[in-house]
Amino acid sequence: MKTKCLILAVALTVIFCISSGRRVKAGNPPTSASSPAGTATVRGEVKFVGIAPKPTPINMAADPSCAKQHSTPALNEDVVADAKGALQNVVVFVADGLGDRTFDPPTQPAVIEQKGCVYQPHVLALQANQRLEVVNDDPTSHSVHATPVSNREWNKAEPPGTRVDEAFAREEVAIPVKCNVHPWMRSYVAVFKHPYFVVTGTDGSFDLRNLPPGTYTIEAWHEKLGTATQKTTVGANETKAIHFVFKPTSGS
């Protein structure tokens, strides 16, 4: 009888250990860029107050192969706002509040295309060590030249139909990217150590999702109009709305 009880006790112990092991394996994965664990959201709009400057046409006469790709002149994108003031090409991001959390970069690359001798998109944001592909869809050659302050500078010739594959290791807002062949070509790349960033589109809106609950400094960056910051506290499963307003500057 004692022998049977001992065998039963050992068997129950083994079953419990196996079951416990399975529960551990089914736990939540580590927080990463591909699977942020938070449930909070900060959203809002970026507005331009005042009379927005009219986009000026780009003079592409220096390279006829560029100009002939446009039925109407391409326009500068340094300040783009609609009639209601919705401001495009603003990088909105968490500037402070994430503590020592770490995030893996996405496996998919961020892409800039060169079409009609214009960088598309004009402003791009990605994570540190995420691959950046710069694709040349033009029939003419380009020279892609990134001029960062905190990262490694690079300058690469790019014949038609080729691509440049690079990455930035450090956080930096924002890195100018130009073409040494076509001086009107300019783009900006913002680099972050976390996935909580967005570039505003035509409606000027932003949506920072999957944030851990906490108090954050949210910053908005624009290439001509400068920066603005706001602090907000958001709880689990909560959505907070904030808004940024930019005004004309002497250089805009």
Region annotations inferred by a language model:
Residues 1-8:
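Bacterial N-terminal signal peptides that target proteins for export
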Residues 21-252:
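Extracytoplasmic copper-binding redox domains, predominantly the cupredoxin/blue-copper superfamily
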